[in-house]
């Protein structure tokens, strides 16, 4: 056991402990600390999982003061998940209430960027023996803290995409009136596809609606100091969703520089770092400070001017710094909201108002304000587990079995109406309406049709001849039978819904939208993989072309073009090709448009005799539609020299050639140097995947994002002689010393007296939770 350290500077930098400490011999304190550390380590490293036959445990992801997280595989489907075990979940009231709060919140939320509960294992033991809670969550390989402080490339596109997902999930959370209060990189889970999910809702609280709730809001507030908003440190009593936006700004700045923005060693140092960048708070903020001594301390400091963000992050994107400056402000009301941040130009590439939902209804924190005993909390957790399974079984029943629908009462069939043929004689059409009154007319018109009923003709008279095209009786009978059969078939096959009242369209459920988003994400992943494959293939071809052809290799080798781009490239290549060499007998090509003056003098003679006139080539053809000159390729006889020996030039004795009225481009006499540039521009017409490149390998996460608390294994393995004055080390932990109240609550059920806890607290360098107003002395270190 290492020799006990001397007391560090503490939160106030005065070297005095936060409160009265009982003086004990060094040997006694060391033995007590050793015993407590052994107990703490044994309890936290309990990794025995009893998950039955449904899941197969793969490996442990992380462990902490609240539980252990392991990756697992569901045997039925092969899906990989994360299982969080909370051992002895009901021993300490604070921890039990934290578990209940997190279960309720995660059951209420359904969002892509918030960790989701996939299952809660039912207890397999009697109620009296039920002690451990198993929660099945989404499996994420790493967290943002591991990504930032690793050798993994982190481009501006990665930063943009991570920030967008964080704000998208935060907008959904804030719409439910929930404040996370503990946002930090290790609580943001990330996978190899750059997907981000917010985790660890054990510290979440609702909005404060009255001054009486301020104390409730600060209960158990032991969040990481480096990401804590100024209103919490200065007791401004303005606890809104802007608290989370300050944390997001600190995370944003950490991603840009890959180092913490405000890594304070204690409360005073933290406040000094903030004022070094943001300057002295405004008089309104200073007057709102709740403690008189804190207000006097800030006023005694020399005034500071804010430092431009371009100086803090030289070379960073201007739009990124603009958004960062709107997040990190002393006044909570002056900070940008999550919804407004999503509309910032820096995130315009991903912003889609239709795909950034809100949460309805708001989450109810009424249960959290009640004074609950351990037994009542245990009953509430068991009720939450049963409610989760009841809802899931109800959804499955709705999917498997449709509700039985009562058939519609059969109505009497429509009477059969025999429609007369339009070509049938008027005597066959029986009119039931009264005959119209005859109109007075001077004489009978020869073409008038008498619609009045006429007496049937005598039997002796022959029947009028049947006109061509009339509907026969057999056809009428067949149509009547077909209509009757169709009506009976409809009544027999479709009794589930009334014909006159069609079933209303069902609203789109959250699960359907989730499936749509998963399908979109899958397509994006496929496009990203295809793009990566094309890039590797292009690099391979370029390397092969460079080896075989040297500097003269084709610069377009491996470039993938669409059909339209390839067609445009071929046209451009034809335009850029030099004209084919012509023999001496060939006349020079005329301009593409406009009459050219014929030369009056003799043409210059070539250096070789002309070929036979029988094989003379035809004149070049001009396409009228395009106005482009397309000379036919001419093959010189074998006896002629190459094209370099011929020099046939057009001759215009009256001056320069007339301009082309159509403005058509002239064919070039040499290879155009812009073909490569044009080709690359044409290739950009293809739709690009906006997502950043996937990670080739993600570092293993610590499991902190699953809400297991601080990592005891990493914490206890550190050397005890590493004082706080040495400063935090990047990449080792993303939090300063945590609160001793966590340890006190955790060991509450073991009968440890305050002296033992205080001794262990000093041994492992854990500070007591306090506000800046409680510090006995405020002096700059």
Curated annotation (Swiss-Prot):
Interacts with MAP2K5. Forms oligomers. Interacts with MEF2A, MEF2C and MEF2D; the interaction phosphorylates the MEF2s and enhances transcriptional activity of MEF2A, MEF2C but not MEF2D. Interacts with SGK1. Interacts with PML. Interacts (via N-terminal half) with HSP90AB1-CDC37 chaperone complex in resting cells; the interaction is MAP2K5-independent and prevents MAPK7 from ubiquitination and proteasomal degradation. Interacts with STUB1/CHIP; the interaction is enhanced in the presence of IGF1 or MAP2K5 and promotes STUB1/CHIP E3 ligase activity. It is found in: Cytoplasm; Nucleus; Nucleus, PML body. Plays a role in various cellular processes such as proliferation, differentiation and cell survival. The upstream activator of MAPK7 is the MAPK kinase MAP2K5. Upon activation, it translocates to the nucleus and phosphorylates various downstream targets including MEF2C. EGF activates MAPK7 through a Ras-independent and MAP2K5-dependent pathway. As part of the MAPK/ERK signaling pathway, acts as a negative regulator of apoptosis in cardiomyocytes via interaction with STUB1/CHIP and promotion of STUB1-mediated ubiquitination and degradation of ICER-type isoforms of CREM. Residues 55-347 form the Protein kinase domain. This is Mitogen-activated protein kinase 7. It holds the Pfam family Pkinase. Residues 407-781 are annotated as: May not be required for kinase activity. Residues 2-77 are annotated as: Required for cytoplasmic targeting. Residues 78-139 are annotated as: Required for binding to MAP2K5. It catalyses: L-seryl-[protein] + ATP = O-phospho-L-seryl-[protein] + ADP + H(+); L-threonyl-[protein] + ATP = O-phospho-L-threonyl-[protein] + ADP + H(+).
């Amino acid at each position: 056991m290492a020799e006990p350290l001397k007391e560090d500077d503490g939160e106030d930098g005065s070297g005095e402990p936060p409160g009265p400490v009982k003086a004990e011999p060094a040997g006694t304190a060391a033995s007590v600390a050793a015993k407590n550390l052994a107990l703490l380590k044994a309890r936290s490293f309990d990794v025995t999982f009893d998950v039955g036959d449904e899941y197969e445990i793969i490996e442990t992801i992380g462990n902490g003061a609240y539980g252990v997280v392991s990756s697992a595989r569901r045997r039925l489907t092969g899906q990989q998940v994360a299982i969080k075990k909370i051992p002895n979940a009901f021993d300490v009231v604070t921890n039990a209430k934290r578990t209940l709060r997190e279960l309720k919140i995660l059951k209420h939320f359904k969002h892509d960027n918030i960790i989701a509960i996939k299952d809660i294992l039912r207890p397999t033991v009697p109620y009296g023996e039920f002690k451990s809670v198993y929660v099945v969550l989404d499996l994420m390989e790493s967290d943002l803290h591991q990504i930032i402080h690793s050798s993994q490339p982190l481009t501006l596109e990665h930063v943009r995409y991570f920030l967008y997902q964080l704000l998208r999930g935060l907008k959904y959370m804030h719409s439910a009136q929930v404040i996370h209060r503990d946002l930090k990189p290790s609580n943001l889970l990330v996978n190899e596809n750059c997907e981000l999910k917010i985790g660890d809702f054990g510290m979440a609280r609702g909005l404060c609606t009255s001054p009486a709730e301020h104390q409730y809001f600060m209960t158990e507030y032991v969040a990481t100091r480096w990401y804590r908003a100024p209103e919490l440190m200065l007791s401004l009593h303005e606890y809104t969703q802007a608290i989370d936006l300050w944390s997001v700004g600190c995370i944003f700045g950490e991603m840009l520089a890959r180092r913490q923005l405000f890594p304070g060693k204690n409360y005073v140092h933290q406040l000094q770092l903030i004022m070094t960048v943001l300057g002295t708070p405004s008089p309104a903020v200073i007057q709102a400070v709740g403690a008189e001594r804190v207000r006097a301390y800030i006023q005694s400091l020399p005034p500071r001017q804010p430092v431009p963000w371009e100086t803090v992050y030289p070379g960073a994107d201007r739009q990124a710094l603009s958004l960062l400056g709107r997040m990190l402000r002393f006044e909570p009301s002056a900070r940008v909201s999550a919804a407004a941040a999503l509309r910032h130009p820096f995130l315009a590439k991903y912003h889609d108002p239709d795909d950034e939902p809100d949460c309805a209804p708001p989450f109810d924190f009424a249960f959290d304000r009640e004074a609950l005993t351990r037994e009542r909390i245990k009953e509430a957790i068991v009720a939450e587990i049963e409610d989760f399974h009841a809802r899931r079984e109800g959804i499955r029943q709705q999917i498997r079995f449709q509700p039985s629908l009562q058939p519609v009462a059969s109505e009497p069939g429509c009477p059969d109406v025999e429609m007369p043929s339009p070509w049938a004689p008027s005597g066959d059409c029986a009119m039931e309406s009264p005959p119209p009154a005859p109109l007075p007319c001077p004489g009978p018109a020869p073409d008038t049709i008498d619609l009045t009923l006429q007496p049937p003709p005598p039997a002796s008279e022959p029947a009028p001849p049947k006109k061509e095209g009339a509907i026969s009786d057999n056809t009428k009978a067949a149509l009547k039978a077909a209509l009757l059969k169709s009506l009976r078939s409809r009544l027999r096959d479709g009794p589930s819904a009334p014909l006159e009242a069609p079933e209303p369209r069902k609203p789109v459920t959250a699960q359907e939208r989730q499936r749509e988003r998963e399908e979109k994400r899958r397509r994006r992943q496929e496009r990203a993989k295809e793009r990566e494959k094309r890039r590797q293939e292009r690099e391979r071809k370029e390397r092969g072309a460079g080896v075989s052809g040297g500097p003269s290799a084709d610069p377009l080798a491996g470039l993938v073009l669409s059909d339209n781009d390839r067609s445009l490239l071929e046209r451009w290549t034809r335009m850029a090709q030099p004209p084919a060499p012509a023999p001496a007998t060939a006349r020079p090509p005329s301009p593409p448009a406009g009459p050219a003056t014929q030369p009056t003098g003799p043409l210059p003679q070539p250096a070789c005799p002309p070929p036979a006139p029988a094989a003379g080539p035809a004149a070049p053809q001009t396409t009228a539609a395009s106005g482009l000159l397309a000379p036919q390729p001419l093959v010189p006889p074998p006896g002629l020299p190459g094209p370099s020996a011929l020099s046939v030039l057009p001759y215009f004795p009256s001056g320069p050639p007339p301009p082309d009225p159509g403005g058509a481009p002239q064919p070039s006499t040499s290879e155009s140097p812009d073909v490569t540039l044009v080709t690359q521009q044409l290739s950009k017409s293809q739709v690009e995947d906006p997502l950043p490149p996937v990670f080739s390998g993600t570092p293993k996460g610590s499991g902190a994002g699953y809400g297991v608390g601080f990592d005891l294994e990493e914490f206890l393995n550190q050397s005890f002689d590493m004082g706080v004055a040495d400063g935090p080390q990047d990449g080792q932990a993303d939090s300063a010393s945590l609160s001793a109240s966590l340890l006190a609550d955790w060991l509450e059920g073991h009968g440890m007296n305050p002296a033992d806890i205080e001794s262990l607290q000093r041994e492992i360098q854990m500070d007591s939770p306090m506000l800046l107003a409680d510090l006995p002395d405020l002096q700059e270190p």
